[in-house]
UniProtKB/Swiss-Prot annotation:
Domain F-box: 6-52
InterPro entries: At1g61320/At1g61330-like (IPR053772), F-box-like_dom_sf (IPR036047), F-box_dom (IPR001810), LRR_At1g61320_AtMIF1 (IPR055357), LRR_dom_sf (IPR032675)
Organism per entry: Arabidopsis thaliana
Gene3D superfamilies in the cross-refs: 1.20.1280.50, Ribonuclease Inhibitor
Signal peptide: none
Descriptive protein name: F-box protein At2g39490
Domain of life: Eukaryota
Amino acid sequence: MEEHKPDILSCLPLELLLYIISFLPFESARLTPLVSTRFRSVWNQAILVAHSHNGSIEDISHAVSRFINNFDEHDPSKNTRKLELHVDKSTFVSTILAPHNVMHMSFFFSGGSKKEESFCWRLEIDDQIPRRVDSSGFLVKTLCLDSVNSLTHEVVSSMVLEFSLLDSLKICRCKRLTSLTIDSPTKLLHLSISGCPKLRYLEIISFKLKTFHYQGSLPLIKIHEHFNLTKAVFDVTQGPSYYNNALDIGPLSLTIKNSQSLTLCRWMFEEVIKPSISSSWRSFQFYKLQELRWIDNSMNQEQINSLISFLKLCPSIERLFITIDSNTYSSNEEVSVNADHARVVLRDLEVVKLEGFKSEEDKNQLIFALQEIVSIDQPLLVLSSIS
């Protein structure tokens, strides 16, 4: 039987192994456990600082700040990328420093923790331009917050004010969050919110916002001033969460008017967008829209009419993706193709992708309707999968 050659790397001193890892890009360094058996334990030491901390929730801010400020990618003793905190024997906080200035912060709560309550959250981002940027420490530009609750949202807010270069924010799984205000007039460029089922009110003060991703029930949204999104995702298959039929959604329609990429549910077009632009139907168009992702619960003739009605507002559309999800909320509004746009021809539409269609008949009806509004000289590539 052939003898295995000795694992040379495993024989190296710990300090030298840590030194080697410190010069590797994060995505490469995380694969080192596959290289050597000893690297498995070395990798854990290189990225993880575990704290058994029995202080208060307010102490989280100080611990995380020290962790961030002490980070040095090229110093083996300071190249730790994960911090774990145990607070009050019931709260667990995980902070990960990822490549490209991304910080993930997740909260976990045991069954014995204090009862979570519904909460309103105002999150301010310091818009002052720093006079000088300290080259030491970890510079947070993208912050991902997971499962913030009524007990921790204030300490998170105080931490965010310290991130002077923050321009991207992701908030997810805040299950008791009912009202959220994002206040960043000049800094924030990217905002993503998902998995917040109780959210009823969203206020955005961010004049420079370029991308917005929202997943969940559509809340009442208040827009301050005007900003132009280049990409907007409204994955609101669960329908609306507001109860005000007089919702003023006009400012929201204006923010997505110049989007290049848009994800939309049919019901949102029928109940929200179309009523808000009814007075300017002849002139309102999504001039810059190149990619549309359309979500519906089925595709009968009325729903095809609704889609065609929207497409006629998009003269520059190039790519169309249609997803049928039977669990999607359905609007009861009646929509007909507007006569003012009856002669519109889509000259740039090249690709149509269909997903979730249950029958060939539905698919063929839609393709026929699309051919009616596509330029006769324009080849159309249709990709489809039957559910």
